[in-house]
Amino acid sequence: KEGYIVNYYTGCKFACAKLGDNDYCLRECKARYGKGAGGYCYAFGCWCTHLYEQAVVWPLPKKKCRA
């Protein structure tokens, strides 16, 4: 599974500025989803890879982004 990291409180994606390989996104993906996860900046959001099937990613059902 793959997807954007989501902030459970705001319903928004984790933003990033440096596209492609991105230490911030990689660190956040691993912290949220475990050591096996990968991550990079895609379309100015942190995109995580190698997630378990039940991982919660953006968009959250019935919750719009409220920054």
Curated annotation (Swiss-Prot):
> What keywords would UniProt list here?
Disulfide bond, Ion channel impairing toxin, Neurotoxin, Secreted, Toxin, Voltage-gated sodium channel impairing toxin
Q: Which residues form the LCN-type CS-alpha/beta domain?
A: 1-66
Found in which tissues?
Expressed by the venom gland.
Alphabetical list of Gene3D superfamilies matching this protein: Knottin, scorpion toxin-like
- Which GO MF term does the entry hold, naming one? toxin activity
SMART domains from the UniProt entry:
Knot1 (SM00505)
Q: Name one GO cellular component term.
A: extracellular region
Where does this chain mainly localize? Answer: secreted
Q: Where in the cell is it found?
A: Secreted
What are the BP-aspect GO terms? Answer: defense response
Top-level taxonomic group? Eukaryota
Q: InterPro entries attached here?
A: LCN-type_CS_alpha_beta_dom, Scorpion_toxin-like, Scorpion_toxin-like_sf, Scorpion_toxinL
Which cystines does this chain contain? 12-65, 16-41, 25-46, 29-48
Q: What does this protein do?
A: Beta toxin that binds site-4 of sodium channels (Nav), reduces peak current (observed on Nav1.6/SCN8A (IC(50)=67.7 nM), Nav1.1/SCN1A, Nav1.2/SCN2A, Nav1.3/SCN3A (weak), Nav1.4/SCN4A, and Nav1.5/SCN5A), shifts the voltage of activation toward more negative potentials (observed on Nav1.6, Nav1.1, Nav1.2, and Nav1.4 (weak)), and induces resurgent currents at negative voltages following brief and strong depolarizations (observed on Nav1.6, Nav1.1 (weak), Nav1.2 (weak), and Nav1.3 (weak)).
What family name appears in the similarity comment? Belongs to the long (4 C-C) scorpion toxin superfamily. Sodium channel inhibitor family. Beta subfamily.
Per the record, the domain comment is: Has the structural arrangement of an alpha-helix connected to antiparallel beta-sheets by disulfide bonds (CS-alpha/beta).
Miscellaneous section: Negative results: does not show inhibition of peak current on Nav1.7 (at 140 nM).
Name of the protein in question: Beta-toxin Cn8
Which organism does this sequence originate in?
Answer: Centruroides noxius
